[in-house]
């Protein structure tokens, strides 16, 4: 059936048909760089990173543009508070954003333009709107005339009358309509400015995204994304000014991710109930955060809490333990031929594992083709993991069939890992990393754990099972779980 995406513009799932066959052009609104990013920003960027990765996985040629808003009232206000220039603020937080995105494991977009590097394009677009009588000068400002654009508010499904009746808008007598918005702002004394036909000033918020997206992607492109909070006014205004200027449809598919909530309230700086990406990644592995953010459908709200992150951590640990068992089986089967699986030689359990492994890519693809349903995609991964655990636990030794199956499992999971940006660490490394993080929260030192395990090993050799059991119980009381195998005793944290 092909890929179907939910288009905010139509309110329906639609078949995805790119403007140019074999190519995808997508633009995602980046951050205003005046402060550290919170995990609401993490969600938007992880969501569109996975969408970007999935298009690449499908073999499409993707141009992905994500901007920086590096001039804005918030940036200027912070610069004034700190007594520095605006560009020092923006450059500082661009670096912080880039560091956060790197820690989250995001692929770099094709292009990351800055508003301040596209002033000429912005001025040209504003002038076009004036020439076409969609914009007017008001002192040193230039405003967009919303009443001139017949389909204004078509993205959010509102009306000007409803907006005006329910709005608390400061009256500006220079505006022809209270909902008119700024394309160009006259510079106040002491503010950064650029020369323009309307005097010294700077861009409004919305115009920069239209100018930059159309420069790199053309007048009509495939996908524009962002958080639901951007539907109005930002994306609504982008549509108005872009389509007024070109007379063509601006974007074919509008995608919006849901909010991250705390206690059923949207997480945001303005509400003061936010956690920065850095704060969360200092406490949890980056893959755990990605796993958590992808555990719900991207359009649904997701509730952030330590409990939910701990549950995500436990889920990811289960998957990695299964992958570790696959690695251990392959390591134990040094003499395996590595030949392709001979389905006719498999027993019933092996046959079930073969079927689930060979179908995982198709099931994963079906989930992703249904509006990038990562929650369902994850469910298919867990289904495979349960089968892996059952079959490997019931299998004695590493037969050629089992080794061939494990090789196949590794290859299939690697494909999924490339799309989701998780499961890509070496299993042993991830589990050790996770154990170290958990151990940091214990009230017993790692050295003491290792000492007690060594003492228990000696007690077992001496057949002092009473002491052996005492040590196991002592460690269990500290949330330490012991696992005995032919290779020795390993431990993990509950």
From Swiss-Prot:
Its main location: cytoplasm. Its cofactor is Zn(2+). Its EC number is 6.1.1.16. Binds 1 zinc ion per subunit. Keywords: Aminoacyl-tRNA synthetase, ATP-binding, Cytoplasm, Ligase, Metal-binding, Nucleotide-binding, Protein biosynthesis, Zinc. ATP binds at residue 269. It is found in: Cytoplasm. A motif ('HIGH' region) lies at residues 31-41. A motif ('KMSKS' region) lies at residues 266-270. Zn(2+) binds at residues 29, 209, 234, 238. InterPro entries: Cys-tRNA-ligase, Cys-tRNA-synt_Ia_DALR, Cys-tRNA/MSH_ligase, CysS_C, Rossmann-like_a/b/a_fold, tRNA-synt_1_cat_dom, tRNAsynth_Ia_anticodon-bd. One of its GO terms (biological process) is cysteinyl-tRNA aminoacylation. It is an enzyme of class 6 (ligase). GO terms for cellular component: cytosol. It catalyses: tRNA(Cys) + L-cysteine + ATP = L-cysteinyl-tRNA(Cys) + AMP + diphosphate. GO terms for molecular function: ATP binding; cysteine-tRNA ligase activity; zinc ion binding. It holds the Pfam family CysS_C. Monomer. Belongs to the class-I aminoacyl-tRNA synthetase family. This is Cysteine--tRNA ligase.
């Amino acid at each position: 059936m092909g890929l179907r995406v939910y288009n905010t513009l139509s309110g329906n799932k639609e078949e995805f048909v790119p403007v140019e066959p074999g190519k995808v052009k997508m633009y995602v609104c980046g951050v205003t760089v005046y402060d550290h990013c919170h995990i609401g920003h993490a969600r938007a960027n992880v969501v569109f990173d996975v969408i970007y990765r999935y298009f690449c996985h499908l073999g499409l040629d993707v141009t992905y543009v994500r901007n920086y808003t590096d001039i804005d009232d918030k940036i200027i206000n912070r610069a004034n508070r700190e007594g520095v220039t605006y560009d020092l603020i923006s450059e500082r937080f661009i670096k912080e954003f880039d560091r956060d995105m790197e820690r989250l494991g995001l692929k770099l977009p094709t292009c990351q333009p800055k508003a301040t590097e596209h002033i000429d394009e912005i001025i040209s677009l504003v002038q076009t709107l004036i020439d076409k009588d969609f914009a007017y000068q008001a002192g040193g400002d230039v405003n967009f005339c919303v009443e001139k654009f017949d389909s204004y508010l078509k993205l959010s499904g509102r009306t000007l009358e409803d907006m005006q009746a329910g709005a608390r808008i400061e009256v500006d007598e220079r505006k022809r309509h209270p909902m008119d918005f700024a394309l160009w702002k006259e510079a106040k004394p002491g503010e950064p400015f650029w020369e323009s036909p309307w005097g010294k000033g700077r861009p409004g918020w919305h115009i920069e995204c239209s100018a930059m997206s159309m420069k790199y992607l053309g007048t009509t492109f495939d996908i524009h994304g962002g958080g639901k909070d951007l539907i109005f006014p930002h994306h609504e205004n982008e549509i108005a000014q872009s389509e007024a200027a070109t007379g063509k449809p601006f974007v074919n598919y509008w995608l919006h991710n849901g909010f991250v909530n705390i206690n059923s309230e949207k997480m945001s700086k303005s509400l003061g109930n936010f956690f920065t990406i850095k704060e969360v990644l200092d406490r949890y592995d980056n893959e755990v955060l990605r796993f958590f953010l992808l555990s719900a459908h991207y359009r649904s709200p997701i509730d952030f809490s330590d409990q939910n992150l701990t549950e995500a951590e436990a889920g990811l640990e289960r998957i990695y333990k299964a992958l570790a068992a696959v690695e251990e089986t392959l390591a134990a089967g040094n003499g395996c031929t590595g030949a392709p699986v001979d389905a006719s030689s498999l027993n019933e359990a092996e046959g079930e594992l073969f079927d689930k492994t060979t179908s995982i890519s198709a099931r994963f693809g079906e989930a992703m083709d249904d509006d990038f349903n990562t929650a369902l995609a994850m469910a298919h991964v867990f289904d495979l993991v349960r089968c892996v655990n059952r079959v490997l636990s019931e299998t004695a030794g590493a037969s050629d069939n089992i080794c061939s199956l494990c090789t196949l499992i590794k290859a299939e999971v690697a494909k999924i890992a490339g799309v989701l940006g998780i499961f890509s660490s070496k299993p042993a490394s991830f589990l050790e990393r996770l154990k170290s993080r958990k151990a940091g929260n214990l009230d017993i030192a790692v050295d003491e754990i290792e000492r007690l395990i060594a003492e228990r090993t000696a007690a077992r050799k001496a057949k002092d099972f009473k002491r052996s059991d005492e040590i196991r119980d002592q460690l269990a009381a500290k949330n330490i779980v012991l696992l005995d195998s032919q290779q020795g005793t390993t431990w993990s944290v509950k």
